[in-house]
Amino acid sequence: MAYHISGMLQQSPPESSHALDVQKLRNPTVTFWSVWEGEQLAGIGALKLLDDKHGELKSMRTAPNYLRRGVASLILRHILQVAHDRCLHRLSLETGTQAGFTACHQLYLKHGFVDCEPFADYQLDPHSRFLSLTLCEDNELL
């Protein structure tokens, strides 16, 4: 997590970095996953419940040695399935706007996310991009 938070702070000012620290990841509204290859951590991701129908994608990060190997897609697909299994209707995320986030943007757009307005407690910020995906309506997967 220290690597993830440090990376966020290298690309965004502190007031625009919304990464969850370890304590916040322990909140009962957050489910955290990690992908390992043997004893090597390949990537992480989390799902934070905002309410009973809306979740937020958090803490998505791929370890440097695993970039461009499908780890982020694997984690994202797993979180999308869990969100659907929990009957969430919408999954949203906040990410950065700097060039270092281009691969993130491509990943989310590839999986059907679209730009949206700030959600939850977020405010408009030139360093933030907000994306959302409608998962299901009336418990039907879209």
Predicted feature residues:
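Short amphipathic alpha-helix that is part of the acyltransferase structural core
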Residues: M1-S16, L141-L142
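Conserved GNAT acetyl-CoA-binding A-motif
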Residues: H54, L76, A83-G96
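Glycine-rich acetyl-CoA-binding "A-motif" of GNAT/NAT acetyltransferases
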Residues: T29, E37-G43, A103
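Conserved acetyl-CoA-binding loop-helix of GNAT-fold acetyltransferases
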Residues: T62, R68-H84, Q106-K110
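Active-site rim helix/loop that mediates acceptor-substrate recognition in acyltransferases
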Residues: L9-E37
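Conserved beta-strand-loop-alpha-helix junction that forms the acyl-donor binding cleft
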Residues: L93-C104, Y122-P126
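Conserved beta-strand in the GNAT
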Residues: S34, Q40-L49, E56, R61
